[in-house]
Regions:
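Conserved G/P- and acidic residue-centered "switch" motifs that form tight phosphate/ATP-binding loops
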Residues: 85
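Acetyl-CoA-dependent GNAT
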Residues: 2, 9-82, 91-102, 155-163, ...
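Conserved GNAT acetyl-CoA-binding A-motif
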Residues: 98-110, 121
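Loop/turn elements at beta-strand to alpha-helix junctions within RNA-recognition modules
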Residues: 78, 112-115
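Conserved catalytic-core motifs of GNAT/GCN5-like acyltransferases
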Residues: 108-110, 123, 128-151
Length: 181
Protein backbone atom coordinates (compact mmCIF):
# COMPACT_ATOMS: atom_id res chain seq x y z
CA UNK A 1 0.00 0.00 0.00
CA UNK A 2 1.20 3.48 -0.85
CA UNK A 3 0.48 6.68 1.02
CA UNK A 4 1.19 10.27 0.03
CA UNK A 5 2.43 13.10 2.20
CA UNK A 6 4.32 16.37 1.95
CA UNK A 7 8.00 15.87 1.10
CA UNK A 8 10.29 16.84 3.98
CA UNK A 9 13.94 17.78 4.13
CA UNK A 10 14.64 14.43 5.84
CA UNK A 11 13.47 12.69 2.66
CA UNK A 12 16.62 13.99 0.98
CA UNK A 13 18.47 11.37 3.02
CA UNK A 14 16.30 8.62 1.49
CA UNK A 15 15.78 9.55 -2.14
CA UNK A 16 18.86 7.85 -3.59
CA UNK A 17 16.97 4.58 -4.03
CA UNK A 18 14.33 6.44 -6.04
CA UNK A 19 16.77 8.28 -8.32
CA UNK A 20 18.44 5.15 -9.70
CA UNK A 21 17.84 5.19 -13.45
CA UNK A 22 19.41 7.24 -16.21
CA UNK A 23 16.10 8.95 -17.05
CA UNK A 24 15.79 10.53 -13.60
CA UNK A 25 17.48 13.88 -13.12
CA UNK A 26 19.35 14.18 -9.83
CA UNK A 27 19.99 17.72 -8.65
CA UNK A 28 22.18 19.22 -5.96
CA UNK A 29 20.95 19.42 -2.39
CA UNK A 30 20.50 23.20 -2.56
CA UNK A 31 18.19 22.80 -5.58
CA UNK A 32 15.84 20.47 -3.69
CA UNK A 33 15.91 22.67 -0.59
CA UNK A 34 15.13 25.76 -2.67
CA UNK A 35 12.03 24.07 -4.11
CA UNK A 36 11.01 22.84 -0.68
CA UNK A 37 11.32 26.38 0.71
CA UNK A 38 9.57 28.19 -2.17
CA UNK A 39 6.94 25.68 -3.34
CA UNK A 40 6.32 23.15 -0.54
CA UNK A 41 2.78 22.55 -1.79
CA UNK A 42 4.26 21.18 -5.02
CA UNK A 43 6.63 18.72 -3.33
CA UNK A 44 4.95 15.40 -2.49
CA UNK A 45 6.40 12.04 -1.45
CA UNK A 46 4.94 8.57 -1.80
CA UNK A 47 5.93 5.95 0.72
CA UNK A 48 5.36 2.30 1.46
CA UNK A 49 3.56 0.99 4.51
CA UNK A 50 6.93 0.58 6.27
CA UNK A 51 7.91 4.19 5.55
CA UNK A 52 10.29 3.65 2.62
CA UNK A 53 10.28 6.42 0.03
CA UNK A 54 8.83 4.99 -3.20
CA UNK A 55 8.60 8.17 -5.28
CA UNK A 56 8.19 11.91 -5.31
CA UNK A 57 7.12 14.86 -7.40
CA UNK A 58 8.46 18.39 -7.25
CA UNK A 59 7.27 21.41 -9.13
CA UNK A 60 6.57 25.09 -9.00
CA UNK A 61 4.29 27.83 -10.25
CA UNK A 62 5.67 30.38 -12.66
CA UNK A 63 4.78 32.83 -15.40
CA UNK A 64 2.41 35.76 -15.61
CA UNK A 65 -0.97 36.39 -17.19
CA UNK A 66 -2.06 33.62 -19.55
CA UNK A 67 1.37 32.02 -19.12
CA UNK A 68 0.85 31.49 -15.37
CA UNK A 69 1.20 27.75 -14.89
CA UNK A 70 2.32 24.84 -12.77
CA UNK A 71 5.53 23.15 -13.83
CA UNK A 72 6.59 19.56 -13.12
CA UNK A 73 10.29 19.75 -12.37
CA UNK A 74 10.67 16.06 -11.53
CA UNK A 75 8.45 13.06 -10.99
CA UNK A 76 9.99 9.69 -10.33
CA UNK A 77 9.10 6.35 -8.83
CA UNK A 78 11.59 3.73 -7.63
CA UNK A 79 11.81 0.78 -10.06
CA UNK A 80 10.18 -1.82 -7.75
CA UNK A 81 7.10 0.42 -7.41
CA UNK A 82 6.53 1.33 -11.05
CA UNK A 83 3.40 0.33 -12.96
CA UNK A 84 1.29 0.83 -9.82
CA UNK A 85 -0.14 4.24 -10.82
CA UNK A 86 2.01 6.05 -8.26
CA UNK A 87 3.33 8.53 -10.85
CA UNK A 88 -0.23 9.19 -12.03
CA UNK A 89 -1.37 9.91 -8.48
CA UNK A 90 1.60 12.20 -7.87
CA UNK A 91 0.76 14.07 -11.09
CA UNK A 92 -2.89 14.37 -10.02
CA UNK A 93 -1.78 15.93 -6.74
CA UNK A 94 0.36 18.49 -8.56
CA UNK A 95 -2.51 19.28 -10.94
CA UNK A 96 -4.88 19.76 -8.00
CA UNK A 97 -2.46 22.22 -6.36
CA UNK A 98 -2.13 24.06 -9.68
CA UNK A 99 -5.90 24.42 -10.06
CA UNK A 100 -7.14 24.85 -6.51
CA UNK A 101 -4.27 26.70 -4.84
CA UNK A 102 -2.80 28.70 -7.73
CA UNK A 103 -5.68 28.88 -10.25
CA UNK A 104 -3.18 28.56 -13.10
CA UNK A 105 -3.90 28.06 -16.79
CA UNK A 106 -1.96 24.86 -17.45
CA UNK A 107 0.65 22.40 -16.24
CA UNK A 108 3.77 21.76 -18.28
CA UNK A 109 6.68 19.36 -18.11
CA UNK A 110 9.75 18.39 -20.09
CA UNK A 111 10.41 14.75 -20.96
CA UNK A 112 13.19 13.12 -22.92
CA UNK A 113 12.00 12.51 -26.48
CA UNK A 114 13.31 8.94 -26.20
CA UNK A 115 11.32 8.15 -23.02
CA UNK A 116 8.39 6.53 -24.79
CA UNK A 117 6.91 4.99 -21.63
CA UNK A 118 6.71 8.35 -19.88
CA UNK A 119 5.33 10.07 -22.99
CA UNK A 120 2.56 7.46 -23.27
CA UNK A 121 1.73 7.88 -19.58
CA UNK A 122 1.51 11.66 -19.93
CA UNK A 123 -0.63 11.38 -23.07
CA UNK A 124 -3.05 9.06 -21.22
CA UNK A 125 -3.28 11.75 -18.55
CA UNK A 126 -4.26 14.38 -21.13
CA UNK A 127 -0.88 15.99 -21.84
CA UNK A 128 0.09 16.80 -25.40
CA UNK A 129 3.27 18.04 -27.08
CA UNK A 130 3.50 21.83 -27.17
CA UNK A 131 7.00 22.00 -28.70
CA UNK A 132 10.21 20.03 -29.13
CA UNK A 133 13.30 21.56 -27.53
CA UNK A 134 16.39 20.59 -29.51
CA UNK A 135 19.33 19.50 -27.37
CA UNK A 136 17.59 20.36 -24.07
CA UNK A 137 19.28 17.54 -22.15
CA UNK A 138 22.85 18.55 -22.97
CA UNK A 139 25.74 19.50 -20.75
CA UNK A 140 25.04 23.17 -21.41
CA UNK A 141 22.86 25.38 -23.57
CA UNK A 142 25.41 25.39 -26.40
CA UNK A 143 25.90 21.60 -26.46
CA UNK A 144 24.74 20.32 -29.86
CA UNK A 145 24.93 16.71 -28.71
CA UNK A 146 22.17 16.86 -26.11
CA UNK A 147 18.98 14.87 -26.29
CA UNK A 148 15.76 16.59 -27.34
CA UNK A 149 12.90 17.18 -24.92
CA UNK A 150 9.20 17.36 -25.52
CA UNK A 151 7.54 20.24 -23.70
CA UNK A 152 4.14 18.74 -22.89
CA UNK A 153 1.13 20.64 -21.56
CA UNK A 154 -2.28 20.03 -20.10
CA UNK A 155 -4.85 22.80 -19.81
CA UNK A 156 -6.46 23.44 -16.43
CA UNK A 157 -10.03 24.62 -15.81
CA UNK A 158 -9.06 28.29 -15.95
CA UNK A 159 -8.04 27.95 -19.61
CA UNK A 160 -11.59 27.52 -20.86
CA UNK A 161 -10.58 27.94 -24.53
CA UNK A 162 -7.55 25.63 -24.22
CA UNK A 163 -5.23 28.27 -25.70
CA UNK A 164 -2.30 27.11 -23.59
CA UNK A 165 -2.12 23.73 -25.32
CA UNK A 166 -2.18 24.88 -28.95
CA UNK A 167 1.16 23.80 -30.40
CA UNK A 168 3.82 26.51 -30.62
CA UNK A 169 4.01 28.28 -33.99
CA UNK A 170 7.61 27.12 -34.24
CA UNK A 171 7.37 23.54 -32.92
CA UNK A 172 11.11 22.81 -32.90
CA UNK A 173 13.11 25.31 -30.85
CA UNK A 174 16.57 25.59 -29.36
CA UNK A 175 16.72 26.15 -25.58
CA UNK A 176 17.72 29.81 -26.00
CA UNK A 177 14.69 30.48 -28.23
CA UNK A 178 12.17 29.52 -25.59
CA UNK A 179 9.99 32.10 -23.92
CA UNK A 180 10.03 30.63 -20.41
CA UNK A 181 7.57 32.87 -18.66
Amino acid sequence: MTSFRPFSSLDLLKYNLVNTDCLTETYGLSFYLSYLAHWPEYFVASETIDGALSGYIMGKSEGEGRLFHGHVTAVTVAPPFRRQNIANKLMEKLERVTEEFHDAYFVDLFVRASNENAIRMYEKMGYGPYRRVIGYYGNNALDDGGEDALDMRKAMRRDTKKRSVIKAKKFEQKPWEIEWH
